Regions:
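Active-site-adjacent betaalpha module
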Residues: 2-4, 13, 23, 27, ...
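Short hydrophobic beta-strand that contains or immediately precedes a catalytic carboxylate
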Residues: 7-8
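Short acidic, Gly/Ser-rich segments with clustered Asp/Glu that frequently serve as metal-coordination loops
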Residues: 11-17
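Glycine/Thr-rich phosphate-binding loops of Rossmann-like dinucleotide-binding domains
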Residues: 16, 49-50
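Flexible, glycine- and charge-enriched loops at secondary-structure boundaries
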Residues: 18-22
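Von Willebrand factor
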Residues: 32-48
Length: 162
């Protein structure tokens, strides 16, 4: 059984609220590294015509400079569900990963879709609740309850690192 920390969409075009969780995400990265987990970074590329954010090859699509990038496991998706990235799906299969620790943004979109689809696929999913944010902070608690209702374990980072 292999485990992975999945950091979702902590890019320059994401909500400014990422600044509230990036230190926690970096601590989660340190913990995952010390625990021998794989660490992956998911980036969203928006290929829809007429949109301005998350455009491929722009500063907005880059990972934020405050994020501690400790591996070359950076996968790009064009849909909200990270499992739709063929390269990420292949990485999961090749490394026999079946347990996921998830953090990042947006709680109401890409994190939600990814967690839902991971549990639907039968994976064990742990959401690091104090390392998840949203454009709409009022929705975060509702989303954490949703993740639990779909079979995810939801805990703060300190509970995982204890």
């Amino acid at each position: 059984m292999s485990k992975v920390l999945v950091v979702i969409d902590i890019q320059n075009d994401i909500t400014k609220h990422y600044k509230d969780i990036v230190d926690g995400i970096n601590k989660a990265i340190d913990w995952a590294k010390e625990s021998g987990m794989y660490i992956v970074y998911i980036k969203h590329n928006n290929t829809t015509a007429g949109t301005r954010t998350f455009k491929p090859e722009t500063k907005g699509a880059e990972l934020v400079p405050e994020l501690n990038v400790v591996s070359n496991n950076i996968f790009v998706k064009t849909k909200s569900n990270a499992l739709t990235s063929e390269a990420f799906a292949a990485f999961i299969s090749e490394n026999h990963i079946n347990e996921f620790y998830v953090c990042g943004a947006d709680a109401t979109a890409c994190v939600k879709s990814t967690c839902f689809n991971m549990t639907k696929a039968g994976y064990s999913v742990h959401v690091i609740s104090d390392c998840v944010t949203s454009y709409d902070l009022k929705k975060v608690d509702e989303m954490l309850a949703y993740y639990e209702s779909k079979g995810c374990e939801v805990k703060v980072l300190a509970e995982y690192t204890a």
